From Swiss-Prot:
Family: Belongs to the glycosyl hydrolase 5 (cellulase A) family.
Main location as per UniProt: secreted
Name of protein: Mannan endo-1,4-beta-mannosidase B
Glycosylation sites: 107, 165, 286, 318
Signal peptide bounds: 1-24
The UniProt record lists the keyword Cell division: no
Organism from which the protein derives: Emericella nidulans (strain FGSC A4 / ATCC 38163 / CBS 112.46 / NRRL 194 / M139)
Amino acid sequence: MRLIHAVLGLLAGAAPALVAASPAAPIGNGRDQVSKAVGRHFEIDGKVQYFAGTNCWWLGNLLNDFEVELAVSQIAETGYKVVRTWGFFGVNDPSNPGQPVYYQVLNESLYEGGLGINYGSNGIRRLDTVVSLAERYDIQLVLTFMNNWNDFGGINIYSNAFGSNATTWYTDKKSQRAYREYIKFIVNRYKGSSAIFAWELGNEPRCKGCDPSVIYNWAKSVSAYIKKLDKKHMVALGDEGWLCPPEGDGTYAYDCSEGVDFVKNLEIETLDYGTFHLYPESWGYNYSWGSEWVLQHDAIGKRFNKPVVFEEYGTPLNHTQLERPWQLTTVKETQVAADFIWQFGTVLPVEGTEWGDVNSIYYGTEEYEVLAVQHAWEMARKKVPRH
């Protein structure tokens, strides 16, 4: 057994093999203000305001500090206030990780309790750099704790380690213990940072064919756990906003088949705001329906007097033509508190466009000026209604 990584997630009474390393970059040197929900909006930077953000899942996946800083500086220059990025990168076998960066290892044969943390140069230090640079450039982060999908260590690595699957994961004791211990590690490491906007339970959690109570109970329990660790920062679910109306039209977004009920989950007191995503092409809808989806979630947010965030949206082609109407609906017709396009793209000196995808909006392009720069300006100048 090669104990290259420090041990986390140990059972009560067990002693860690190594002492947790301090952050590799300066953290905790930014402003004292903590973002919070105020009615249907957010107070950020000491002001209740609308704002735009972006997704950039790959920030911590870069091995070069200069490239991380380049991306963060361009995001800040755009006028974005918040970046949603992965707070996880996990593997089962550290001797053959299959990816350049990994923060966590799930393997019961290597670690008591099953969870190890990589403190090497391609481990948690990469996220330290992201958090430190976010502080320096005065932007905030939504850190997501797990992935419903298999990319870069999702539920699949828990399945490999503990025998759970995509639906039993939410109630599997070993999986949930390791998941909570990882949350505890991340929250305790960064809760003193001014760069944290919110903690997020997962990226697009689903439980296909399950009763919505499975996700609801899991989200209620885990969000309460996070609030015990950190009473200051917000917590979100990270779901796609699926709806379960009793008399729905039976189509995918309204049939509850993914086991997620956006309305029910918004009732959870320890979730500070709701999230919804939009990918009409993948879901079997026409693009014009997207604006209706935005309006529906805005109306639900009004009912609960909670912020809702249009947290992901994208198309594989004709970005400006297809996505701009959704942005204009958000700006002109709703009180959606913020929106985060999927996703920020740039050309990096070493990595190039390695981590982009067909939805990426690349810095410096004509479409970026419209969908990123102009939209961030529109959201920033939008007036918050007086109550």
